[in-house]
Amino acid sequence: MELKHGYYHLIAILTVAIWGLTFISTKVLINHGLTPQEIFFYRFLIAYLGIWVISPKRLFTNNWQDELWLVAGGIFGGSLYFFTENTALGITQASNVSFIICTAPLLTTILSLLFYKSEKASKGLIYGSLLALMGVGLIVFNGSFVLKISPIGDLLTLLAALSWAFYSLIIKKMAGRYPTIFITRKIFFYGVLTILPAFLLHPLHPDTAVLLQPAVLFNLLFLAVLASLICYVLWNVVLKQLGTVRASNYIYLNPLFTMIASFLILDEKITLVALGGAACIVCGVYWAEKK
């Protein structure tokens, strides 16, 4: 029995809520000595092995063109996205990265309108998106509106946002041709495969003593099983059912859930400016999704 349409919106919100927690898990792993490339590699490798149990039979797509599209999906939604984002975090301010990365829904909308005639952008969607983006800015900069420009870092972050936008379009293209789980498995495989060249610059040195620490193991499994395996499958279903524009709009909620998690887990304070930003995000997303 197919889910009612409204449930896909709930799935989108829950998926983005889980992704909002990934920043905290990644921070814990980095504090334990893992590099961003290692975190991504272990995360996608575990997710790939997990999804292989569910979808082991089919190896390839119907033709090499579709296979290349999924290679591109593994790059744009995996290795390139995480590599550029995490590299940018080491170059520019975290606030810059958090804000610029949330332009992904806006970029997705622009690309969707350019490449797909079926995608439409109403005034409500445009104004709602801009209001939500303003809310993201209020949460990220938290009243300190000093944007320190770091050209390389900011361009890398913009590339990450653009990469995710292209990933969304690729999933839309492939969604009608292959099962969602098969597509997601291929994304994980090519994501792992295409991150390997990064280890030529920074060789991988697995430390069993570190990897088996409870905090490291728990957060790696959270990122791999819940945030990757389960959430990527769910998100790809949402993209198929709601369309790239409407689905991507929920990504604006990401900083909101990160803020709440930081308050509950890291005991970080929530200011009035951040609360105002949260209100803008919720109202903006509702406005954009309302028909």
Give, region by region, the residue ranges found by the protein language model.
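Membrane-interface helix-cap regions at the ends of transmembrane helices
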Residues: 18-21, 25-28, 47-63, 133-148, ...
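Specific transmembrane alpha-helical segments of multi-pass solute transporters/efflux pumps
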Residues: 22-23, 52-101, 137-138, 224-242
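Hydrophobic/aromatic residues within transmembrane alpha-helices
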Residues: 29, 39, 43, 88, ...
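Transmembrane alpha-helical segments that form core, pore/gating elements
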Residues: 51, 108-110, 146-206, 234
